[in-house]
Amino acid sequence: MERYDVVLIQEVKDKGQTSISKLWRLLNTTTGEDWGMVKSGRLGKSSRYKEQYVFFYRLQVARLAGSYQVPESRLYAREPFSVQLDYDSYCENDHDYFYYDGSHCEKTVVLMGLHAQPDQAVSELTQLATSIRRVARVFPHADGVVAMGDFNADCSYASEDEREDLEIFSSRHFRSLIPDTADTTSGRSDCAYDRVVVYGSDVMVRDAQVYNFREDLGLSAKVAAKVSDHYPVEFKLY
């Protein structure tokens, strides 16, 4: 996680939230920097199974300007959760994930997380375009919205034909940064489940990719599986 300035973690199931608090403390101590944390409520239609979205961000880089939870409905198993972050473009320091572009020193972006239910991924992703526009209206001063997460947008959950009919992948108003050919899983499957979708022409991004931590860190398949069954998807804002 030290690789990043802002991190979204999904599928947090710990009801007591001790694990996420421990991770927060470790981030602060191991990096030597202060990190902020903002989390959604516990989401899910079953009383026995709920998840949370959690954003971590370097306080040296970003400031939380607001958050928004899409209201509960039957449209999602776990409604999207968004944060608005004001961030410095690093006029005077060496981080390269947010950096000075020569004309601005501060920008604002909305980051939205969605963990789509596998067996209703297509219907949730159909609704996602509407939810993104809604969040853009909630935060009208932001440059735009970046929706991300495990969309389950591939293989048996969302076919190529089904994806072609989805507005987030077909409309000129949206930019999908992770290609269908990507593999975002750390196991034996080869599926582009995890995606990044940008809404708003003022959101400037580059270098979107899947971070294969197993290969980069030289981990065995067994160890990598203990870290996560998905690889992170990453991008740079400028």
PLM region descriptions:
Residues 1-238:
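Divalent cation-coordinating acidic motifs and surrounding scaffolds
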